[in-house]
């Protein structure tokens, strides 16, 4: 791997980017791409010792990289608050990429009484983003990019508010799909609210298509069959290719709020603007999701 700037990534000289889950998987590739573009990158992680190796690898590939680690567990609202308190009064944040994701094989409840997949993949990023708004809005060109998934349109295709936390029936795949749909809905709604308030914030989303990452193996809590692994080898993108949609959403100077990037051919391909799933276009559902999210996290929209 070289230290060149990828063609989908504009120069980020002088800009500060926060990447959640930047110590592994697509989060790591996102952090690497932004470091190559000369951004100052803040990588968040739940475990500092394990993440140091990942950051050292970025520095070895990009010797001039400005990258540092910060502790953050998105499944814990207390951890989110502590991180926000450390960051919000510091340097302006130009870019927040909510890339961290988890699939929990069996239903777990966090210390806050929340289902863990929903907390990690959506409610934590919701609270984090609203908490960091003051730092983002000190940037002349602030941007938030939510990493969604093709799974957002699978299953029910809309948020099941009657069983949002899987109390009646828990499926790891459905929980993940619902959280990723919520991420996309949040990206659209945040952009609309920022625009209505006269704020310069761009809020968009991206999906990586089908990527060969650890997350793909974790959906059912077991190693996939030989047949599934063979199909993945045929149709899944390498992570360094899958990340291109995320990097384009995060850096494209022509991006607008509500835009959604993904591979040209769905599973793989060059990053292009994708069609937003119908479930995410329901204004009433987005408004209700926002209200529920504020209630569950205790974090309010205060532009």
Residue ranges and their predicted role:
Residues 54, 186, 242-245, 289, ...:
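Alpha-helical packing segments of well-folded alpha/beta enzyme cores
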Residues 179, 229-273, 283-287:
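C-terminal helical subdomain
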